[in-house]
Regions:
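Compositional signal for N-terminal targeting/processing segments
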Residues: 1-255
Length: 255
């Protein structure tokens, strides 16, 4: 019978890098599943470049990509302060899988779909709150506020953070966390069916580990796969600020 092992990581943690490498060495999986979609996988291979104006236009939603941009800046800043490149644990999983000739499965939902569903799910008040929260978080990190990265992987801390996020933005939590938990669980169950005697190692963010595990243990709780992949419609006026950026070569978030 196929076996699935899920490693929960912090995205800017040297300990997570070490844990991923150790898990591959000890578990000897037949496939390594990572919490990336093809576009993020390609970006990681390019050393995590910032989204260009063309990328923004391709996503077709300025506000959604701005959220991604702010989150990426915050993650890079934290990574610089703790001496670990953002996404280093995913890179470690990719590098070690390739070194051992282990197939890699990209099991996360298309980032464009996630961002569009996330932004479209928010009401005006939630969007304003989200923007201010991100700006304040960046300001706190820039001011040198210490962050205990490893504590973010402790289950009680994870539960508290997830609960606070759900209170802060219930709709956002559904799109960013719950839907992706279900999507990744669907993908892992499919991999398990394809490899009845295989060993599957999944490398995911610590905040997703419990939700994914619950779905795998109780498949009846899963949302139908098709309903998780629909891309909501966006409005043409969302491109106007982007065209202005393109003409003026302005980058709203410094790298």
């Amino acid at each position: 019978m196929a076996e699935i092992k899920i490693v929960g990581t912090a995205h800017v943690s040297q300990q997570s890098v070490d844990e991923v490498r150790a898990a591959i060495e000890e578990f000897r999986p037949d496939v390594v599943a990572i919490e990336l979609d093809p576009s993020r996988f390609a970006a990681l291979k390019k050393q995590g470049r910032d989204p260009s104006v063309n990328d923004v236009l391709e996503v077709r939603n300025f506000n959604a990509l701005l959220v991604q941009w702010l989150l990426a800046y915050l993650q890079r800043k934290i990574g610089f302060d703790v001496g670990v490149e953002p996404g280093a644990e995913m890179k470690a999983a990719i590098e070690d899988a390739e070194k051992h000739n282990i197939p890699i499965a990209l099991v996360d939902r298309d980032i464009r779909v996630t961002l569009l569903r996330f932004w479209n799910s928010l009401g005006i008040a939630e969007k304003i709150k989200m923007g201010w929260a991100l700006i304040i978080s960046i300001a706190e990190v820039d001011a040198g506020q210490e962050i205990d990265i490893e504590s973010l992987k402790q289950q009680d801390v994870i539960d508290m953070v997830m609960e606070e996020f759900r209170k802060f933005s219930p709709n956002g939590a559904r799109a960013l966390i719950d839907e992706r938990d279900a999507y990744i669980a669907h993908q892992l169950i499919l991999l398990k069916a394809q490899r009845p005697e295989g060993r599957i190692l999944a490398v995911v963010g610590a905040g997703h580990r419990q939700g994914i595990t619950n779905h795998i243990d109780n498949p009846s709780t899963l949302t139908p796969f098709d309903s998780l992949t629909r891309e909501p419609k966006s409005f043409p006026w969302a491109k106007i600020p982007l065209k202005m950026l393109e003409m003026n070569s302005i980058r709203p978030i410094p790298s």
